[in-house]
Amino acid sequence: MALLCLDGVFLSSAENDFVHRIQEELDRFLLQKQLSKVLLFPPLSSRLRYLIHRTAENFDLLSSFSVGEGWKRRTVICHQDIRVPSSDGLSGPCRAPASCPSRYHGPRPISNQGAAAVPRGARAGRWYRGRKPDQPLYVPRVLRRQEEWGLTSTSVLKREAPAGRDPEEPGDVGAGDPNSDQGLPVLMTQGTEDLKGPGQRCENEPLLDPVGPEPLGPESQSGKGDMVEMATRFGSTLQLDLEKGKESLLEKRLVAEEEEDEEEVEEDGPSSCSEDDYSELLQEITDNLTKKEIQIEKIHLDTSSFVEELPGEKDLAHVVEIYDFEPALKTEDLLATFSEFQEKGFRIQWVDDTHALGIFPCLASAAEALTREFSVLKIRPLTQGTKQSKLKALQRPKLLRLVKERPQTNATVARRLVARALGLQHKKKERPAVRGPLPP
């Protein structure tokens, strides 16, 4: 397999293999043609994230950006059509150098979203400066559920009505076989109109004509009140049944949505991230997209062979968090407080005005300092520290790496090391005298 050249430098065999696998992953994602899906990569080094961004630039329909902070920073791949335009008009995280020739050899097809024509000189198919999304960036879940509930209530009333009809619509009265018993629907409609007001009763009386061509006699008028009362009871009972069915359906739908949300958090949420970290990660992803209802898809690529070993909190046990001190204190003041450990190599790394990291040369020194009490400040293990302090420590693992202690030596070993460094030769031992020639 030929090695790829990036920025005038050939990639190593491992990076070349990584780029080819990323291309296969992006090809598979592009074939799905689902705008609601985004591809989320695991935390990788800055070099591998850069290779992903440069590889994504070869796909005109895809866009890439990064989310997260520190060693938890991750790369996201999405479709170009749902990417929020950036302030400089480019959707990618990096701009191609001006010396490199452009990879675009013509305008791309304009998106079929009814957008206005792109002005001349602007790149077709991409967002340009001044363009704003056609839909709001974020719609609260409460409003979305209210809209869904409104649509669900109308569909429930239509679906649960007998024979596919709404009993409250008077237009359905008289339809069908004229010989059938239609007195009950007609009287029920009339009963509901009586509840509305006496003024509207006379207007709806012609609805009784389809029942029979002959007017009602005195005998039928005498039993009219009983039938109206029965029809009214039937209508109220049907209405209560509809309301109970609607409430039960909405409750089931709400429970189903909550279960789906929990499953999405369990399945899509990375195992290394807590629920709060995953919610922040999801919020940061949706802030970069015009489509808020998205599905996060994990990559099928096994990056374990490419991922560098990331530092953990257990590797930083010699680091403590210094807190609860006056903002006016300076580095010299903190070092003076830990003067006993300064000779061994104690260092200070600032987080903010009231928090700092104390880096001890060994675990024993850190454990000894934790047992003491200081008057002007407090200390605690990094595992119990604030989120900002942990992030600061994990961002600079080399700076916080435990320093190896110098091996003990003596004067003889020191002289030998100095002599070797200066290139001095040891005195050669005298060789024994050469024997004379052997007799013939």
Curated annotation (Swiss-Prot):
Pfam families: R3H. The modification Phosphoserine is found at residue 236. The keyword Coiled coil applies. One of its GO terms (molecular function) is nucleic acid binding. The gene is R3HCC1. Transmembrane segments: none annotated. Residues 154-225, 254-276 are annotated as: Disordered. It comes from the Eukaryota. The keyword Transferase does not apply. Keywords: Coiled coil, Phosphoprotein. Residues 157-168 have a biased composition (Basic and acidic residues). InterPro entries: Nucleotide-bd_a/b_plait_sf, R3H_dom, R3H_dom_sf, R3HC1/R3HCL. It comes from Homo sapiens. This is R3H and coiled-coil domain-containing protein 1. Disulfide bonds: none annotated. Residues 257-276 have a biased composition (Acidic residues). Residues 16-81 form the R3H domain. Residues 242-300 form a coiled coil.
